[in-house]
Amino acid sequence: FEDAHYYDEFDRWGEHVVEGSWDAEIVDDLAVREEDHVVVKHTYDAFYRTDLEGHLDAHGIDDLLVCGTLANVCVLHTAGSAGLRDFRPVVVEDAVGCIEESHREYALEHADWLFGETIAREDVAFAPAPAAD
């Protein structure tokens, strides 16, 4: 996801990840490849007003690994939204951050209770990518 927030939410959260600014850029370690699909999200929920659901449906994707900077905000809301849309979200517990550790712990406990599973990065297994045409 590419995070790009609007100015009208800064009264609550302060200025952060402004669309087009340096802090909204995707880091080099996660460089976008030609075959990648980038979803630009403007809210806590990566499904809200984006093409994410349609893209996942079109590619037959049901299982989602969810990670990110704020476990108790974007990660939890995106995972919850995925669950409501009949996807199977799994939060990667050591690939999420938070400002307060107690908020991170709450988010992980809540995700585990809601979705039945959180997972450590070392336990993530990926299926081989399909062969290119």
Segments from the language model and where they lie:
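Active-site-adjacent betaalpha module
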Residues: 3, 7-133
